[in-house]
Amino acid sequence: KGMDLLAKRIDEIKLHGVQCGMGGHDLRVVQEIEKPKLPVDFYIKTLHHHKYPTAPKPHELTAAYAEIPGYWCRDPQELVEFMATVEKPWIAFKVMAAGAIEPASAFQYAFKNGADHVLAGMFDYEIAEDAKIACDILSNLERTRPWRS
């Protein structure tokens, strides 16, 4: 019943000529939408590595309270492997883990691992530098997941 209701809402959104995306912090959101192949146009899902000083420790990633409402990308490898099977565009967010990961590392990791777009928070004075970093990475990027947008 829940997925049928969600499918109806997606159709209503599309009737207005608006794209409809779904996602969140938990990979299960994307997985559950993919099972019945609901007609969303794109996904938005957190992605970042855990190679930073304040990264979650393995024991912090096992309990629901640590991941939900979701402050981390709990299992980046599981996400990357799953998204490799998804044929819709993917916007990765929280790629810099609230500033704990440098833009170059964050953007490289996200794009190399299949994200089609990166939603990155930054201050106005960081835009030019971060855009240059992204352009440099994209000009010399090797990835296995095909670009979806």
Regions flagged by a language model, labelled:
Residues 14-15, 35-44, 86-89, 112-117:
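Glycine-enriched alpha-helix->loop->beta-strand junction motifs that scaffold or abut catalytic
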Residues 8, 77-92, 96-149:
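Structured C-terminal cap/extension of enzyme domains
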Residues 2-3, 35-38, 57-59, 104-107, ...:
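Short, glycine/charged-enriched secondary-structure capping and boundary segments
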Residues 26-31, 48-52, 98:
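Short, catalytically relevant binding-site loops at active-site mouths
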Residues 1-41:
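Glycine/proline-rich, positively charged
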Residues 1-2, 19-26, 44-49, 67-73, ...:
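Catalytic beta/alpha-barrel core
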Residues 1, 50-51, 72, 97-101, ...:
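Short, small-residue-enriched loops and turns at beta-alpha junctions
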Residues 34-70, 81:
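Histidine/lysine/aspartate-rich catalytic loop segments that bind and position anionic ligands
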